[in-house]
Amino acid sequence: MTIKKYTLLTALSVTAFSGWAQGNNTTDNNDEMVVTANRFPQPKSSVLAPVDVVTRADIDRWQSTNINDVLRRLPGVDIAQDGGMGQRSSLFIRGTNSSHVLVLIDGVRLNQAGITGASDLSQIPISLVQRIEYIRGPRSAVYGSDAIGGVINILTGRDKPGTTLSAGLGSNGYQTYDGSTQQKLGEDTTVTLAGNYTYSKGYDVVAGMPGAGGPRQPDRDGFMGKMLWAGLEHQFNEQFNGFARVYGFDNRSDYDGYTNYSNPLALIDTRKLSSRTYDTGLRYKNGIYASQFIASYNRTKDYNYSPLFGQHDITASLDEAEQYNLQWGNTFQLTNGMISAGADWQEQRTERKSSNQNTTADFTQHNTGIYLTGQQQISDVTLEGAVRSDDNSQFGWHSTWQTSAGWEFIDGYRLIGSYGTAYKAPNLMQLYSAYGGNANLKPEESKQWEGGVEGLTGPLTWRLSAYRNDIDQLIDYSNLTNGYFNINKATIKGVEWTGSFDTGPLSHQVTLEYLDPRNADTHEILVRRAKQQVKYQLDWQVADLDWSVTYQYLGQRYDKDYSTYPEETVELGGVSLWDLAVSYPVTSHLTVRGRIANLFDKDYEMVYGYQTPGREYYFTGSYNF
């Protein structure tokens, strides 16, 4: 776990420039390589910020049906979802807003339509995910806007040649069918194809209706999703390789909605989200230098409509977003460290059509950023730093920086301290929407301090961290002036302990968290964040049976009852949740899996007024050849 003097130097010299954008290599001593923390490859143990890696093997072992189910197991993560599969969700990292999390897909910023500026991970197909790298703490000095609470990098595709076919059934009419293959075309070309279809009848999420939002809807709120992925990679020579990828998904979700003011017969209770992504890149490596260039385009359409009248009716609404990205990154190996320098450019175009289709808003924003990151080891001390400047078409130049230091004061034990600044730029809808847009908005800004100690005590690898995050100029909607303004401040304090150890065939992972997220002006607790969390993951294998037990305790939380005016604060009680999963290899090719989610059928809410599904059963089978 802790960094050794030989680990960083040896690992980087061996693996640093072998497909460094993917971050899925391991060193000779089985220390995983990651790239997300500082935009260069490094052993996971050398990263000074808290970092977690989830592999495809982990996802299969846990039998997660969506990305939210994967992330909820990780330290610092709190998820609030409006019901079951496909319903809107919010992701909070260390108590920061859901819009303060930077989500990357294959290292490229996720394009998210809508006015919130927050990434809704409930809509990303789990079958698309090969690996997740998760960094806690500010990273705007590395990536720019949004990275106040942390960064999640979702890596797609398939990691080795072969073909996998799988199918699954579960509660509430759940069914999924999945296939992927990777084949070599000659010695230098690799083709990867994947597809998925998922369907669930769902259940009635209720959504606190009837109330101010709309009528009671005693129906199932289901979900259907389709996904296709294709990739091509070619090794031109020892120095150059290139790749091209295209993938897309179409999702449809039912929810408890609202009546349209212009047509009382139009009940807006269906969401259709369509996303298409095209990217290509070229990598070069030669000795101590490596470089990568990526170009990417994404288009997302987000409809909300009444099935009675259709998505193109005048009662429907549409958020459409286009995103262009260019990235150029360069990595240099030093004697006992690495540095990375580069630039990225992004253009976003957003179009929103109102519910009467007569009001159309079309906005464009572009951003150019330059960055420099580095890590250097000097004896028992590891130093890390980053600086970045962004030129935004709306608010001009904005600079951020961060620095960290780690001291291995005793063999196997390390003290770590860090400080970082971060920001969140206002999105186009907040700036220019006809419904309260404010072109004078300033970026939200944060300052975060963190101190910690980590060590290897017998079989136990552990880390204790304490942090404080002060966030200024928070953007919120004012009902008094009917517009968006920089009106709030937040102070978030937290303590986090993580540990992992093995006892014979049993593998244990434990997280203990205490969080105090408050509005700095009113001292109110920020909504939908648990003050205490306990997470425990137990995995073991006995007689070819691969078992997994997951426990999560969510402490007291608060929310708002938006069906009242003015909205009232309500308390959501704590809850303990258990999951049980088991898999069995019938043959060397066929594996069957079963899972019980919410084993003891606990009744609880993540969002006030929205029911959770209760106990659920899942059964899947996969065939590899």
Curated annotation (Swiss-Prot):
Q: How does it sit in the membrane?
A: Multi-pass membrane protein
| Keyword Ion transport recorded | yes
One MF term in the entry's GO annotations: ABC-type vitamin B12 transporter activity
Give every TBDR plug domain span.
Answer: 43-157
Q: Does the keyword Membrane apply?
A: yes
For the TBDR beta-barrel domain, which residue ranges apply?
160-625
Tell me the CDD domains matching this sequence.
ligand_gated_channel (cd01347)
Q: Which UniProt keywords apply?
A: Calcium, Cell outer membrane, Ion transport, Membrane, Metal-binding, Porin, Signal, TonB box, Transmembrane, Transmembrane beta strand, Transport
Q: Where is this motif: TonB box?
A: 31-38
Q: Which GO terms describe its cellular component?
A: cell outer membrane; pore complex
PROSITE patterns given in the database record: TONB_DEPENDENT_REC_2, TONB_DEPENDENT_REC_3
Give the source's domain of life in one word: Bacteria
Q: For this chain's UniProt record, which GO biological process terms are given?
A: cobalamin transport; monoatomic ion transport
Chain location of the short sequence motif TonB C-terminal box per the record: 608-625
- Residues annotated as binding cyanocob(III)alamin: 90, 97, 115-116, 317, 528, 562
Q: Which residues bind Ca(2+) 1?
A: 204, 217, 219, 221, 256
Q: Where does Ca(2+) 2 bind?
A: 219, 221, 255-256, 269
Where in the sequence is the signal peptide annotated?
1-21
Q: Which residues cross the membrane?
A: 163-170, 174-183, 189-200, 223-233, 238-254, 271-285, 287-304, 317-333, 336-345, 363-379, 381-391, 395-410, 413-427, 445-454, 460-469, 484-501, 505-520, 528-540, 546-561, 569-583, 596-607, 613-625
Q: Where does it reside?
A: Cell outer membrane
Q: Of which family is this protein a member?
A: Belongs to the TonB-dependent receptor family. BtuB (TC 1.B.14.3.1) subfamily.
Q: What does this protein do?
A: Involved in the active translocation of vitamin B12 (cyanocobalamin) across the outer membrane to the periplasmic space. It derives its energy for transport by interacting with the trans-periplasmic membrane protein TonB.
UniProt cross-references to HAMAP family, sorted A to Z: BtuB (MF_01531)
User: Could you tell me what this protein is called?
Assistant: Vitamin B12 transporter BtuB
